[in-house]
Amino acid sequence: LKSFDGGLSFSDTIRVSENNPSHKYRMGNIKIDYNGNPIVNYMQYLLNWTEPKQMVNRSINFGDSFLGGIEASQSAPGEPCDCCKASLVLDNDDIFLLFRNNNSNERNSYVSKSVDGGLTFNLVNDIDDYDWMVNGCPATGPLGVVYSDSLLIVRRSGATGNDEIVYNKINKVDLNYSYTRNIDP
């Protein structure tokens, strides 16, 4: 749905994901780029809830249509955590997807980057100092903002044996982090 009159009226539903009966889709997020076009992230699964993928799909015509979903998590080991919601961060044509991954029950947070407006996601990095091994779903994902030359990211981790809220400062060019701080005493 979209509105161009302050919410007085709305368009009909506009499909963002593929119309593919062999897949399920859920956990959508939306951001609006500097031109007013929507960029949407969602999870894609097979019908039996296997093979989760973090997808990003963008519009270049204010949401009238979408270019087609791109798998933004493909360069991470394992697969995305199938029950943890991701988030998007935009910086001009750069799109950052923040998500929790599942590599044989290692549930670390990752950042994936597109430098071409979401057509490809070729750079990915694990942003955890310690591996969080848990045989279950943490049900949380990282959130972030752009600040100067960095991404500031907050996330949950239980890797040290304590349930903690952690803050990272990530270089937005190469995705390496300059520091990680526990902000939950």
Question: Residue locations for each model-derived region?
Answer:
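Extracellular, repeat-based ectodomains that mediate carbohydrate processing or recognition
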Residues: 1-185
